Amino acid sequence: MGLRLTPGVRVRLATLAVACLLAVGAQAQTHPLPDPLPSWNDGAARKAIVDFVSTTTTPGSPQFVPPAERIATFDQDGTLWVEKPIYSQVVYCLDRVPDLVKAKPELAKVEPFKTVMSGDRQAIARLSMQDLEKILAATLTGMSVEAFKAEAAKWLDMARDPRWRRPYTELTYLPMLEVLKYLRANQFKTYIVTGGGQDFVRVYAERVYGVPPEQVVGTAGATKFGYGKDGKPFLTKEPRLLLNDDNAGKPEGIHLMIGRRPVAAFGNSTGDRQMLEYTKAGSGLRLSMIVLHDDAVREYAYGPAQGLPDSKVGTFTQALYDEAKKNAWTVISMKTDWKRIFAWEP
């Protein structure tokens, strides 16, 4: 037999139910959703990101972007992690020279290997781009892909940045890591599009950025298929360039490897200009953002845009700054837009 409730009891229960619902609602109002970008100061840059995500992911919005088309590309050096005083991959290659000379002693008398082996930091700093290209070609090829991955991973575990004495993988920008997570939480697919070596970045991209290796587009060299003494197939890295993923090579690499024009792109230098232009030129709402390194205290200050010191690494010219302003790209000021730069900062 079912329980019969008197009209008075029913009224009291209904009143209690309404009160509980109101209490739950009030509790929800006092506990808002966590801030997805806690390391960002309130300002135009933060607002541009939040407004873009909200507008492009809200069903019924005139600027709604279907999840399959939500592609966001990020440069790495100077955009996701520190690129000063020299690119980390170049440091890796310089550190590999002694092992290379040990295997090929004749290189000890050949430039630029002779200069590197001298340990003269000033002389090493004066090496030309052509010299560095020779070093990169010699230290990044001639081994199996698996051997390279193991060697690079070992170096990343041991190497330390000279300024902060921390692993290079700890010199990532916390605000940009938050953007990556925020976009992925809203069904964006995030890609790294870098002028750095594709195989090098793929070693750590998933662990450090949450970006799987198949979503890393970088400067790529050829490989050659073969069989080992045990009969197992493997790939050997060869000194033949397939894709120079810098400047115009970035949109070319995006087309080749991704197959969709990004709706959002992030960079920091002249090497990213064409990627930012290519992204902004698409139909519908687009987001192109560029990081300006203007905080010498917490990181580095270089340009030469806006009167900042000139730099051979991560050059951000005044012409690029002017183009950003003219074409409605958002300039991210490291000094004013970021509360914290690194996760380990107090």
Each model region followed by its residue ranges:
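Short catalytic/ligand-binding loop motif for oxyanion handling, primarily in non-cytosolic enzymes
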Residues: V82, Q89-V90, F200-V201
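Non-catalytic pre-domain segments flanking phosphatase-related domains
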Residues: L13, C20, Q27-Q76, V91, ...
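A metal-dependent, Asp-based hydrolase signature
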Residues: I86, V91-E170, L174
